Regions:
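Aromatic, loop-rich ligand-recognition surfaces of beta-strand-rich domains
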Residues: 3-74, 105-145
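Extracellular carbohydrate recognition and processing domains
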Residues: 72-114
Length: 145
């Protein structure tokens, strides 16, 4: 279950399950039939409450024909099957109590290098464990950096 924050011009996604390594929370993105090349994925935690950031992340890509996300079985792992999503040190350094500063000045984006340039249509992010109780993200980017 995912919810988008309301009542504010700043929206976020909140997933009410922490997941586990055996049963992670998964988000699948469809970049369209002819996506631009990319080599990085960027995540911004929900800056009002960075403790709801995921601890671990797995990134996979696919070009399979999608009718429903659970139908894709040929995912290609990109990088480690268990990479650090956000570390306690990173989050503590950005938890200054004035989250608006991070939007206007510092732009806390955690970038994940995918290695080579790629243009796969689907990206699946698998997340598990959290520094608090849920997973919250303000924004997710796909970019060629």
């Amino acid at each position: 279950k995912a919810e988008v924050g309301s009542g504010s011009t700043l929206s976020y996604i909140e997933i009410s399950d922490k997941g586990s390594e055996e049963n992670p929370v998964q988000i699948v993105f469809d970049l369209g039939e002819n996506p631009h090349e990319y080599n990085s994925i960027g995540l911004i935690p929900r800056l009002q409450w960075v403790g709801n950031s995921p601890k671990y992340l797995k990134i996979e890509v696919s070009d399979a024909v999608l009718t429903r996300s659970e139908d894709i079985t040929n995912w290609i792992l990109v990088g480690s099957a268990k990479r650090d999503a956000f570390t306690k040190t990173e989050l503590d350094a950005h938890d200054s109590g004035n989250w608006e500063d991070w939007y206007t000045d510092k732009q806390f984006v955690k970038w994940y290098d995918l290695g080579e340039n790629m243009s796969h249509r689907y990206i699946r992010l698998s997340m598990w464990d959290s520094w608090y109780s849920t997973h919250c993200l303000d924004e997710i980017f796909v970019s060629k950096r």
